[in-house]
């Protein structure tokens, strides 16, 4: 379906001066109101520390809160410590027409900082005022049906009014004043709905009329050449395509001789985009024409976080999302309406006896209207949430050391299975893991692992198994580090596994075997990778052969960092496990001695038998 978008801009230029004669509401509280061509305006002058609030009353006396509302044509503006302005269109909510005059009842209340209402009173606004005649306003006709999607350029002419009627359009739109704003001499204001004056007074010194406004004049035109004479600081126009027709239909200027042929002109340009953004561009020349400084221009309802996206000496650019920067959103039928205002703060010059300003009050009302029933493609991007921030404070670290039944590490011995029985050189499958941690970025790091003959990790003698996370080089049966299964384990970095070849500890002085059980211990910590630090340990592949012997293993870590095996590892037959040495040599000599004695006895018996047989044979021969 076609994409519909309507843009209406309201450009208000007013001086912060009085409107007509002030009327006393109560002591210290004054107001005045005036009637314009399209609406009425009420000015209230509060006392210090008072905040003015408005409510409108219907024909039955019911009160309704007043807010900036384009549907009801109600607008409230205020100047700090000066005055508060309530503007209402003759077509606005609760404006009643009686005998050719428009009536609006307004309830005014002044609220103190503590929330207490200080002053309150009803005021009835009647336009035109009773002593003036009414001139019919041809602009009060109902708006026409919006046209299909076509980018247009709007020309603005100054008229003494504060409401704009716009033709429907979509896409990229430029509004520009055809004439400079003129500060007219004070004159009686327009006293009822009627057409704009055909002449504009010449510039003279004096006070300013409260409203000098602009209205949409033409649709489908592009900027005149004089608006495209930008001396320096060209800003490329945000438009799809590079043709001259596309550029000019977007309300921008085109010059094929420039590096960026399509650029913004000396005017105010509003662009509404399907992507959910609007772009508002104002030139320095336009700001000076309306008596304001470009540095003081900002979005009226935006917080401090919505500064201009681009600012030069010649232009100020706002490119912001439709849903941010204080933009009001309304749904009317099948239309989505986004509204905001571009305003300028006045530059106040303070002297010893008072203050002055030479700036006008500038207010540009911007509105983007989209057809809510249109179908648009949507592209969704799903971003995984960031992992939680690492915990930096100290706390307990729960570790567990357990022994697996086989090299698959699929099952483990329970507490009742200890002490385990192993023969020399049989493998023992050891695993250390983190408990009660679900942070996938944590890495378990083993520092030292060792064995002792008792349940005390500080008992002597000791034998190192891992040194600084690597297999101890002095072992002729090097400990084998086993990589954790990344697919089978939910947090594989929380595990460290290695395989030990069983051994017996020797006494450091006598070198005799310490018959008994062996206990395993490890010191560990949890590491969080940061930058280039991956928490991994790089080990040297060199092998140094050395006979196991008990030595002092320096343990300086806190007890909370040390984890031990649930039980000991023992041996089935100590005699079978006797290491090679003097006792083994003694047994061999004994066997050899017994064998020698046996052979000697056998030889003696054999010799004796032969001797006896020889004697008998000799005696037989003699006789």
Swiss-Prot record:
The modification Pyrrolidone carboxylic acid is found at residue 21. Residues 226-266 form the P-type domain. The chain crosses the membrane at residues 591-611. Keywords: Cell membrane, Cleavage on pair of basic residues, Disulfide bond, Extracellular matrix, Fertilization, Glycoprotein, Membrane, Pyrrolidone carboxylic acid, Secreted, Signal, Transmembrane, Transmembrane helix. It holds the Pfam family Trefoil. Residues 182-201 are annotated as: Disordered. Disulfide bonds join 228-253, 237-252, 247-262, 449-470. Residues 612-623 are cytoplasmic. GO terms for cellular component: collagen-containing extracellular matrix; egg coat; extracellular region; plasma membrane. Residues 271-542 form the ZP domain. Expressed in oocytes. SUPFAM superfamilies: Trefoil (SSF57492). Residues 21-590 are extracellular. GO terms for biological process: single fertilization. InterPro entries: P_trefoil_CS (IPR017957), P_trefoil_dom (IPR000519), P_trefoil_dom_sf (IPR044913), Zona_Pellucida_Domain_gp (IPR051148), ZP-C (IPR055355), ZP-C_dom (IPR042235), ZP-N (IPR055356), ZP1/4_Ig-like (IPR054554). Proteolytically cleaved before the transmembrane segment to yield the secreted ectodomain incorporated in the zona pellucida. O-glycosylated. SMART domains: PD (SM00018), ZP (SM00241). Belongs to the ZP domain family. ZPB subfamily. Polymers of ZP2 and ZP3 organized into long filaments cross-linked by ZP1 homodimers. Interacts with ZP3. Component of the zona pellucida, an extracellular matrix surrounding oocytes which mediates sperm binding, induction of the acrosome reaction and prevents post-fertilization polyspermy. The zona pellucida is composed of 3 to 4 glycoproteins, ZP1, ZP2, ZP3, and ZP4. ZP1 ensures the structural integrity of the zona pellucida. This is Zona pellucida sperm-binding protein 1. It comes from Mus musculus.
